[in-house]
Structures are given as structure tokens and as C-alpha cells.
């Protein structure tokens, strides 16, 4: 998926960059794979899967930098526009 053509995913692109920079390459790779390698039927399906990965990361790694916390929250705000009950 080309982020230039899909500006709605820039938050997730930045999250991937920051996750890698803070040593969370495994979850960054999972998000990158979902965003760029999987052919999704709908954008809402993609957002749901990205949201589940983010929630899993937040559960397993509760302490991160303030910048990463803000990016995680921003990305989840986008996910919750489509999946308001995601937990």
C-alpha cells in the first residue's frame, strides 16, 4: 500500500517507524506486513487487524515513551472510528 496515495494510513506508518526506533521491531514488522503485504477486502478489515495488533502490544508492553503512547492513541482513534467497540 502506497502511503502517499493513502494518507489516512500515515499515522500507522509513523507508528511503525517509532516502534522500530524504540526496539519493538517484531510488532513493527507485523504492522508493516498487514499494511503493505496483505490484500484486504475492505479498509475496515485492515483497520480492525491493525487495531488488534496495537491492543496486543499495549497489553504486553504497557510502558513506552510519551511520543509512542501518543502515536498508539492516535492510531487507535482512527481504528475506533470504524470499530468503536474494539477491545
Question: Can you say where each PLM-predicted feature lies in the sequence?
Answer:
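C-terminal-biased regions
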Residues: 1-87
